[in-house]
């Protein structure tokens, strides 16, 4: 595994903490989640069962890893805080637990955050494509500030008001957001192409997009993406697998997009 990983890893394998598990065949319950940073790869299986099927020549392995120096920084922070560090996990696995669960389809998670937007194409619970683009909520704030000639504090307040006012309203994507959304649309299409052309994936066609992240509350973003890409787009609900008092529904719906990663991390040992 290390030999194959060395062809893909950005660092020497000796400088990384890695964990691997089989994608095909028997996998212990919850084993695939005990990981740091993930990327599927194909390993020669050593024997060929049925020459008619190219996939039979390989064993698919999910390898996860991170630089030892990065992991040590997190360990040191938790020691200073006098907290017991249980595990280090990736955003992708946390989001899969919180938003996809046991759905075995091909799904894209679009995490529209403050500084960047992350895209993950997930097939049968395994992330096969991970992309990131430096566009996020702060990009929207700066554009509002430039367009309206106001400071960024007021622009941030305007953005939040825009999100609140947009909930349940009719109409299309605000014009101010269109130039920001176009690079994200381009990245989505590129991720779709990467996934479709991967040799060892099975479904090939993404069935839906789940939208999450603190900036996903912006008005009409799901509708705009659905119309532009011709695919079903939903805002993710990280509370769908969580039992909570009904009188908290309004508050949880408001903070849900920002809590998906945290909820997924909390669900790590509950599967």
Task: Name what the model sees in each region.
Residues 57-58, 123-126, 201-207:
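Short, surface-exposed connector motifs at secondary-structure boundaries
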Residues 78-80, 124, 225-230:
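Short, solvent-exposed amphipathic alpha-helical segments in soluble enzyme
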């Amino acid at each position: 595994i290390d030999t194959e990983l060395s062809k893909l890893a950005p660092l020497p394998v000796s400088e990384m903490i890695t964990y691997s598990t089989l994608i095909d065949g028997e996998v212990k319950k919850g084993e695939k989640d005990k990981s740091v940073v993930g990327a599927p790869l194909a390993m020669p299986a050593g024997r060929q069962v049925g020459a008619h099927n190219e996939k039979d020549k390989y064993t698919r392995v999910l390898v996860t890893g991170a630089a030892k120096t990065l992991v040590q920084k997190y360990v040191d922070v938790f020691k200073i805080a006098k907290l017991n560090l249980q595990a280090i996990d990736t955003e992708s696995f946390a989001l899969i637990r919180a938003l996809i669960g046991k759905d075995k389809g091909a799904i894209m998670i679009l995490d529209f955050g403050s500084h960047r937007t992350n895209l993950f194409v997930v097939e049968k619970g395994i992330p096969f494509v991970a992309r990131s683009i430096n566009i996020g909520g702060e990009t929207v704030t700066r554009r509002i500030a430039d367009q309206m000639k106001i400071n960024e504090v007021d622009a941030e307040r305007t953005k939040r008001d825009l999100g609140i006012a947009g909930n349940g309203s009719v109409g299309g994507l605000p014009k101010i957001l269109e130039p920001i959304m176009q690079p994200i649309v381009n990245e989505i299409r590129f991720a779709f192409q990467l996934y479709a052309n991967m040799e060892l994936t099975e479904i090939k066609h993404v069935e839906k997009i789940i939208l999450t992240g603190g900036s996903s509350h912006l008005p009409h973003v799901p509708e705009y993406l659905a119309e532009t890409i011709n695919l079903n787009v939903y805002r993710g609900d990280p509370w769908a697998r969580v039992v909570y008092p009904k009188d908290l529904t309004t508050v949880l719906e408001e903070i849900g997009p920002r809590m998906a990663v945290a909820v997924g991390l909390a669900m790590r040992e509950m599967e």
